[in-house]
A protein has these predicted regions:
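Phosphate-backbone binding interfaces of nucleic-acid-interacting proteins
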Residues: 1-166
Length: 166
């Protein structure tokens, strides 16, 4: 059986217990622990952001040009094809240089500054798949869109996403 630490934390406070100690204590209680893995541990430079505004892309009927705050003075312009967003949503933002998981081949990839149909994009808004997470830990999250952070997450803009989602 695979046990989510996030799920277990709903029943027992694991805040100050590292993974190895948790596994050792589970084994001492009579439960067999074969190992543990930290989902999304290869993900880097992804932070909490807020969608400030969304405009239709001038050259596409399915893309949006978003202004996104990550706590800095100037918002980032990010182009997305996600259809589940609205202004003021709090979302994971992969900054230029970030490492995320490619949804197609499940390999790590670096985010680069680029253009989508002629409009500059300085990052990427992330789904939970791209963060190496599953819907088991976030059942409220949209399976086919950007991961909009819920009330169980810290929503401090600019915070590392691993810290924010616990």
């Amino acid at each position: 059986m695979i046990l989510s630490r996030k799920w277990a934390n709903d029943y027992v406070d694991l805040t100050d217990i590292d993974n190895k100690t948790f596994c050792d204590e589970m084994t001492l209680s009579g439960s067999k622990v074969e190992g543990y893995e930290v989902e999304g541990s290869d993900i880097e430079n992804v932070v909490v952001g807020q969608v400030l505004s969304m405009e239709k892309h001038p050259d596409s009927d399915h893309l949006w040009v978003c202004q996104v705050s990550v706590g800095d003075d100037q918002p980032l312009q990010i182009v997305t094809g996600a259809q589940n967003l609205k202004p003021m949503d709090i979302v994971p933002v992969a900054l230029v240089g970030a490492t995320v998981i490619n949804r197609k081949d499940h390999k790590l990839e670096k985010i680069k500054k680029g253009k989508l149909r002629g409009v500059a994009s300085a990052g990427m808004l992330c789904s939970f798949d791209e963060l190496g997470l599953t819907q088991n830990d976030f059942p409220y999250a949209c399976a086919d869109g950007i991961f909009v952070l819920g009330d169980d997450c810290d929503k401090t803009l600019g915070m590392d996403i691993h810290t924010a989602i616990g």
